[in-house]
Amino acid sequence: MHLGDLTHPNELHGLKLSELEDVARQIRDRHLQVVSTSGGHLGPGLGVVELTLALYQTLDLDRDRVIWDVGHQAYPHKLITGRFNDFHTLRQQNGVAGYLKRSESNFDHFGAGHASTSISAALGMAMARDNRGEDFKCVAVIGDGALTGGMALEAINHAGHLPETPLLVVLNDNDMSISPPVGALSNVLNRARLSPPMQFLSGSVEESVRHLPFMGGELPAELNRLKGSMRRLAVPKVGAVFEELGFTYMGPIDGHDIGEMMRTFQAAHRDGGPVLVHVVTKKGKGYPYAEADQVGYHAQSAFDLTTGKAIPSKKPKPASYSKVFGQTLVKLCEQNSRVVGITAAMATGTGLDLLQKAVPNQYVDVGIAEQHAVTLAAGMACEGLRPVVAIYSTFLQRAYDQLIHDVGIQNLPVTFVLDRAGIVGADGPTHQGQYDISYMRSIPNFTVMAPKDEAELQRMLVTCLNHDGPTALRIPRGSGVGMPLMEEGWEALPIGRGELLREGDDLLIVAYGSMVHPALDTATLLEEAGLSTTVINARFLRPLDQALIHPLARRIRRVVTMEEGALAGGFGAAVLESLSDQDISIPLLRIGIPDKMVDHATPQQSKESLEMIPVQMAERIRRRFDLGGRDFAGAASVPAIQS
């Protein structure tokens, strides 16, 4: 069977084991071909190919529900549920999404992008099924990294108290989330994985026996019986944890043995309550480079399949904001032993991997546990440390109560670095950092800021650590603008003071963070059309520099705000409210992300669709204030703006 001809996943039912192994090969080939060309998540999907096929052999996918945690391990699922021929559009505008979307396929039963949600969703579906007297299977597939998240453990605790509610949880145990998972539960799983019985089951012994000249490639029945006995020796160490929580535990089993998994899943379906099947897989299975470097090949930009090396960009790029942050924090930690960097399982993504290598005793990884990370930092601050918590903007949403209750109310000197703030591109709506301006500006005691470039980032980090109260610093995804960087000796900025970058009489632009340089480009376009423009780098959201903004607004009488975040409750709203509070009633245009979810595309494509690139913003300004003159949109290569 060729997967391009598959019209429904149930058509895989009844295939021989050898035929399923051929399907697995096709899945891996297509997966590697597409991700090596366009980028995407590589290791997670390669590790669950056989798991996916074995599980789906035991389900009726017209009726049964499968919830994939996070979604980055679901590429094989997509390839056998109608998206094989369109898979080359992965993570591209209007193409196949990198995560699960209910709107994309009837087989995507629950959308995802953040970790640890699958068991809660599957349990909710199972309870709804029982409430309606229906009969279908509910399955959650979750990785060992996501299982460290508190939400997953809360769901397990709940499900364990419902002994007559059938629910299957498949634990995909590859000892990796993005970085290696941390915590006591991960240690329990790791001890089971590394125990002599499981090492025996790892496949090396089996391969050795299979290649004995007198075996003819076959395995004796005695070896299979011995494998079963050895597995039972490993069960008490890990299975007891889940059994005590009310689950029937099955495993650990080889996550690349389709036949064994099919038999186990069928047995699990016959159980009348919650069951956890523990499957041990290898992240990156089938691609040697990904197997050898499971962190580096978790997600990849385009790369050469033969060498495994990333395809270099056509021209060198400045260092990323994340890297500049990481390098600067290393220096600050070396200078001050009270400074501690904290990550929630995203060391490489946030730049804290540099701190882990350079000053490991001032580095903490809490796993996928954002709420814990925030309150842990609060406790450290109470005892005189200066914690710096680096978390993606989209993931800090999960700890909003802790920001208020544990840090804000107590006015503790904790610094938050919100990475991937703004438009992130191909990861789509679950990962856009569009809400942090809105959710941070309402918390009393916080000082909130955003740099216009990587050099200002360095000064802002020092500003945060010098301030005796909670601070938040947002940085965008990707490279800086190429500003020269200092190795040390950074000066703190005055709190609440903006920066006047250029002066003019016709228009005032107040820009925040990553929108400052686009604002300057927009001002240049307007200047060429005869419109003299003042540009302010706001620097601070809380407190806003009213002493700089208000007099200029009164004089110029036309104001534009620019932000790479949601307009609802955002930076523009803060400026508008500030002017209104002082009875400054003037025309104001807010440019940012409107009230909508931003789908997957390149950052440039997303910004074009939101009318946030300079030529579009110049045209919006011209029309909003009826300034006449040049039609910027008509002269641009981008679609004209509809008035």
Swiss-Prot record:
Q: Which SMART domains match?
A: Transket_pyr (SM00861)
Q: Name one GO molecular function term.
A: magnesium ion binding
Sites where the protein binds thiamine diphosphate = 72, 113-115, 145-146, 174, 287, 370
Q: In which pathway does it act?
A: Metabolic intermediate biosynthesis; 1-deoxy-D-xylulose 5-phosphate biosynthesis; 1-deoxy-D-xylulose 5-phosphate from D-glyceraldehyde 3-phosphate and pyruvate: step 1/1
Q: Cofactor: bound how, per the entry note?
A: Binds 1 Mg(2+) ion per subunit. Binds 1 thiamine pyrophosphate per subunit.
What this protein needs as a cofactor is:
Mg(2+); thiamine diphosphate
Q: Which reaction does it catalyse?
A: D-glyceraldehyde 3-phosphate + pyruvate + H(+) = 1-deoxy-D-xylulose 5-phosphate + CO2
Please provide the Gene Ontology terms (biological process) for this protein. 1-deoxy-D-xylulose 5-phosphate biosynthetic process; isopentenyl diphosphate biosynthetic process, methylerythritol 4-phosphate pathway; terpenoid biosynthetic process; thiamine biosynthetic process
Record-listed E.C. numbers: 2.2.1.7
Annotated positions binding Mg(2+):
144, 174
Could you name the Gene Ontology cellular component terms for this entry?
Answer: cytosol
Q: Name one Pfam family in it.
A: Transketolase_C
The record's disulfide annotation reads none
Q: Which keywords has UniProt assigned to this entry?
A: Isoprene biosynthesis, Magnesium, Metal-binding, Thiamine biosynthesis, Thiamine pyrophosphate, Transferase
Function, as annotated: Catalyzes the acyloin condensation reaction between C atoms 2 and 3 of pyruvate and glyceraldehyde 3-phosphate to yield 1-deoxy-D-xylulose-5-phosphate (DXP).
- Subunit arrangement? Homodimer.
Member of which family? Belongs to the transketolase family. DXPS subfamily.
PANTHER family assigned: 1-D-DEOXYXYLULOSE 5-PHOSPHATE SYNTHASE-RELATED, 1-DEOXY-D-XYLULOSE-5-PHOSPHATE SYNTHASE, CHLOROPLASTIC
Indicate what this protein is called per its UniProt record.
1-deoxy-D-xylulose-5-phosphate synthase
